[in-house]
């Protein structure tokens, strides 16, 4: 049985993390699978089959790390990536897959086999910005991606974005492939049946929901502004946001300033967002950019009407709207 290792920052709540758990659980009987993470105690770890092994660089979750450690660990990975690879990965697996952009790619690039794969989930042209630091990082990352035998993208737009930045990577066309995210439809439908209280999603008024990390990319601030304008125009509705992140305090302040506390709800993290999505009338994703937007596919499975901005996530609604 072939041995495969997938590398990812953590198995905390997130789109790529969700996809990885679904993939390895699906493949568990065909391959000997290990997941290598930088951080432990991710919420999705408990959803892994007991056949899947986990190697953790650190046992603690990212959230439990001190501010200093959060800054030091990525630097350590950059400096010590080769020694980390030798200790945990080298010679132990037939196929090595860096499943997410960032620190993991800096470790797995040292693989010697011809089965070294990297997965790209984000819009590379937009995720880093346009300042000097971003341009330097893109230059470094070009050398890293050049080391891989195969580069997998989650959408065609995702691939096109990558090619605009890294068109001069040797043999790039031969390395590239688009593989859309695998989603366990039955799992989503089953989890959507869980009971939630009426106080969470009020069915007496039109409801819009989104599931996203509270980061600038997801543009929740834009959603708040649109919500306020609609309320002022007499279009009454509630908006619910499932997720957490560094922009939470700023968003809370914006909600308070616009006096929409009663109609715009930040609900925090939910390990099972599906019953909330199922209960809402619409699903919205107003991101500035996306690699694909897997959550749109999940909302479609639950028969939600979709509100979306013009990003790579629009591929998910072709033929649907």
Residue ranges and their predicted role:
Residues 6-13, 26-72, 158, 168-176:
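N-terminal strand-loop element at the rim of the active site
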Residues 82-92, 134-154:
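Membrane-proximal helix-turn-helix segments that form the acceptor-binding/catalytic region
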Residues 269, 288:
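Aromatic "clamp/platform" in nucleotide-sugar-dependent glycosyltransferases that forms part
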Residues 96-104, 120:
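Short His-centered aromatic/hydrophobic patch
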Residues 106-108, 148-175:
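A short, active-site helix/loop in glycosyltransferases that binds the activated sugar's phosphate group
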Residues 14-22, 206-229, 246-252, 294:
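A conserved mid-protein helix/loop that constitutes part of the nucleotide-sugar donor-binding site
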Residues 129, 163, 172-204:
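Acidic anion/phosphate-binding donor-loop and adjacent secondary structure
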Residues 252-268:
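Nucleotide-activated donor-binding/catalytic signature segment of Leloir-type glycosyltransferases, i.e.
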């Amino acid at each position: 049985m072939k041995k495969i290792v997938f590398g990812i920052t953590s198995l905390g709540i997130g789109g790529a993390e969700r996809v990885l758990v679904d993939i390895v659980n699906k493949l568990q009987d065909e391959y000997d699978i290990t997941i290598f993470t930088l951080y432990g105690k991710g919420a999705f770890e408990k959803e892994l089959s007991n056949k899947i092994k986990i190697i953790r660089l650190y046992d603690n979750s990212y959230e439990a790390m001190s501010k200093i450690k959060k800054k030091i660990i990525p630097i350590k990975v950059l400096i010590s990536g080769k020694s980390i690879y030798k200790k945990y990965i080298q010679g132990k697996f037939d196929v090595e897959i860096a499943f997410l952009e960032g620190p993991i790619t800096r470790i797995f690039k040292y693989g010697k086999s011809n089965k070294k794969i990297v997965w790209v989930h984000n819009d590379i042209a937009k995720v880093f910005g346009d300042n000097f630091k971003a341009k330097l990082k893109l230059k470094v990352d070009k050398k890293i991606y050049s080391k891989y035998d195969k580069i997998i993208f989650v959408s065609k737009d995702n691939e096109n974005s990558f090619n605009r930045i890294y068109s001069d990577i040797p043999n790039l066309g031969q390395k590239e492939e688009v593989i859309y995210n695998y989603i366990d439809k039955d799992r989503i439908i089953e989890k959507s049946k869980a009971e939630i209280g009426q106080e969470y999603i009020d069915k007496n008024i039109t409801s819009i929901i989104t599931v996203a990390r509270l980061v600038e990319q997801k543009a929740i601030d834009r959603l708040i502004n649109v919500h306020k304008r609609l309320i002022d125009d007499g279009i009454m509705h509630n908006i619910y946001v499932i997720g957490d992140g560094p922009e939470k305090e700023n968003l809370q302040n914006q909600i308070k300033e616009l006096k929409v506390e009663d109609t715009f709800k930040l609900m925090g993290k939910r390990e099972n967002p599906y019953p909330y999505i199922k209960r809402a009338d619409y699903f919205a994703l107003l991101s500035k950019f996306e690699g694909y937007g897997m959550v749109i596919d999940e909302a479609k499975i639950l028969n939600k009407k979709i509100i979306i901005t013009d990003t790579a996530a629009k591929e998910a609604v072709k033929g649907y709207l």
